[in-house]
Amino acid sequence: MTKTIILIPSRLGASRLPNKPLLKIKNKSLINHVYEKGKSTNIGQVYVATGDQEIFDEVVNNNGKSILTLKEHLTGTDRIFEAFEQLNLKNIDYIINLQGDEPLIDVDDIINLNNLAIKNNSEIATLACKLKDKYIDNLNVVKVICNGNIEKNKISSAQNFLRSIKKKN
């Protein structure tokens, strides 16, 4: 039987919306909404990986699991890697990178991602969708460059994540 862990990178240092993970939505922090979505999949253990004591405390004080990482990580992927190494869990086959700022994510999408990761033997997976033209120049939207088209129920390898795209002349 395969084992999956869901790791949720989260930090307070966002310049566009400071303290975003701790903002309340219907009396619950954004990060706890995301954590609960991960837990409700029942596909494996869920941890929030953070370099901020405030986020760690928020999750743990609401009966969640969190792990403190270095604050200096440049990407969520780096934070997840450190958290996974610190946890030192045995027999984990797959890691789901669940974005910490997606409180409205559909639980079925997370489950489907896990199933696709297992089917394709992809050790780490994160969700992405086709980008609408109106978001191409929006620096608030992270873009992913893949080795193929992004389609529903299809897996594609991420080559890079970026906020701005250099346009060809």
Feature names for model-found ranges:
Residues 106-169:
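Conserved core of the sugar-phosphate nucleotidyltransferase
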